[in-house]
Amino acid sequence: MNDQGHSEEMSASESMPERASIAERAAARMASLSPEQRELTERGAEIIRAGGLVAFPTETVYGLGANALDAEAVKRIYETKGRPSDNPLILHVSSIAMTESLVEINWRARLLMEKFWPGPLSIVLPAKEIVPARTRGGLPTAAVRMPDTAVALALIEKSGLPIAAPSANISGRPSPTDAATVRQEIGDIIPLVIDGGDTRLGLESTVIDMTGEHPVLLRPGGLPKEAVEAALNMEVLLPQDQKMIRRSPGTRYRHYAPSIPLRLTAPRAIPVEAENWAWLGTEIPNGAPRIKIIFKDDAEYAKELFRALRTLEKSGAQIIYAELPEENGIGRALKDRLTRAAGG
C-alpha cells in the first residue's frame, strides 16, 4: 500500500490512459522532423546499431549517444570524452515500454513520467540486468529520460535501442548547446553530428532518485524542483551522503569549466583592483569589464550560460566574474552549474 491508501497495482492501472498521451506527445514531436533530419536520423540509427557514436540535439544540451546495451559502444563514449568510468550515463528512451525493459518502475516514478515526459527529467530507478554495469557506472541503479526533440526521439525510435548519452563535449568543459560547438570539440573523432539548431533550455536535465519512499534531488536542472513537488504532492529531499549523489552524472567531478578562471560574486562586489575581466549576469556590474554579457532574466541566463562561458574565454579577458542567482526555480540549476564551473 502507498501513503494515499492505494496499491501500486491500482495506481499503475489508473494511470494507463495517460500512457497514450506520452506516446502522442512523442509522436507529435517526431512529426516535425525535416526531410534532412529524417535522412540524418536514419543514418544515425545505423551507426548506433553498429556500435558507433552520434551527437544529437535534445532540449537541454547536445548529447553524445551510443547503444546503452552495448558495453563496448558505451566504452567509446567514455574514451571520446575522457570521462571517468564511474560517472554513470543517462539512458534516453522513446517509450514507456522501452523504459520498463531497463528499470523497475514504481507508481510515483510512473506518475512523473506521465506528467513530464518527454522533457528535462531523468529518473533514477533500480536497473534490470539488461543494462551493462559500464553504462550504470557500476551502480545498481540507472537514470532514464525521454528527451523532448524530434531528432532525439526519432534516433532512439529508428535504432530500436535505448541511447546512453552524456553531453557531447570533452569532459569538464561547458556543455554544447549548438552543433557548431560539438563539431569544434569532437567533430573530427565521431562519425556524425546531427544539427538541430540551438537547444531550447541550455542546461541539463533534473535528476530525481525515486528508489526510496521519498524523492531525492540528485541534480537540479531544466525542470524546477518545485514542479516535481507539486506533481507528487510531497517534498523532494536533498541527498544526505555522497553514496546517493554518485547515482547521478555531473555531480562529483569538476564540470562546465571555461579555460580561464571563473569567480562568483554580486554585481556591485567586483574587486576594485580587478583588471582585464569579463562579466556575466542579469545586472550591470560596477567597474569597467573588458566585455560583458547581460541577460534579461535567470531563464535566459541559464539558456545561454554555456555559450557565454565559451565566448568569454576567447575574449582576451583574464578572468570571468559571474552573478550568482537566487536558489529557486531555474536559479537553483543555474547556481549549481556556475558553482561547478568555478571549481566548487
Predicted feature locations:
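Active-site-adjacent structural elements in enzyme catalytic cores
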Residues: N2-G344
